[in-house]
C-alpha cells in the first residue's frame, strides 16, 4: 500500500516506514506527529483518487530531523563589464517517517 501526499507544494510517493525529505515544517519539533493531505491511495489493485473520499484520509508521519540540504551556488556574470555576483543557498528540510496510511472507504 502506498499513497501520494502533498507537502510544501510538492507531491511525494510514500509507504509505511518510509523516511521522506520534505520542505521544512517550521511548526513541528522532532518527535511530533504531523498529518499530510492525501491525493491518491493505492492498495493492491484498488486505486482511490476521488477527492470526496480522500478528504477524510490523512497520512500520519513522525518528525525525525530538521536539516539543511546541499549548498547551491548562484553565479551572475556579464561579459566585458567585470560584473560578477556570487550567492549561495541551502534549503532547509524536514525528514519525516511515515507511520500510517488509513485504507480508503469503499
From Swiss-Prot:
InterPro entries in alphabetical order: bL21-like, bL21-like_sf, Ribosomal_bL21, Ribosomal_bL21_CS
One Pfam family per UniProt: Ribosomal_L21p
Record keywords, A-Z: Ribonucleoprotein, Ribosomal protein, RNA-binding, rRNA-binding
CC terms in the record's Gene Ontology section: cytoplasm; ribonucleoprotein complex; ribosome
Superkingdom, taxonomy of origin: Bacteria
GO biological-process terms attached to the record: translation
GO molecular function list: rRNA binding; structural constituent of ribosome
Subunit structure: Part of the 50S ribosomal subunit. Contacts protein L20.
PANTHER family with a match to the protein in the record: 50S RIBOSOMAL PROTEIN L21 (PTHR21349), LARGE RIBOSOMAL SUBUNIT PROTEIN BL21M (PTHR21349:SF0)
Similarity comment: family membership: Belongs to the bacterial ribosomal protein bL21 family.
Function noted in UniProt: This protein binds to 23S rRNA in the presence of protein L20.
Entry protein name: Large ribosomal subunit protein bL21
Gene: rplU
Amino acid at each position: 500500500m502506498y499513497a501520494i501526499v502533498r507537502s510544501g507544494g510538492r507531491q511525494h510517493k510514500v509507504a509505511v516506514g518510509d523516511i521522506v525529505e520534505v520542505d521544512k515544517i517550521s511548526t513541528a519539533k522532532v518527535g511530533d506527529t504531523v498529518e499530510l493531505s492525501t491525493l491518491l491511495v493505492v492498495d493492491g489493485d484498488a486505486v482511490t483518487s476521488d477527492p470526496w473520499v480522500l478528504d477524510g484520509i490523512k497520512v500520519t508521519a513522525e518528525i525525525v530531523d530538521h536539516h539543511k540540504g546541499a549548498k547551491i551556488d548562484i553565479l551572475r556574470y556579464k561579459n566585458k563589464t567585470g560584473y560578477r555576483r556570487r550567492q549561495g543557498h541551502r534549503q532547509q528540510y524536514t525528514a519525516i517517517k511515515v507511520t500510517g496510511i488509513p485504507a480508503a472507504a469503499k
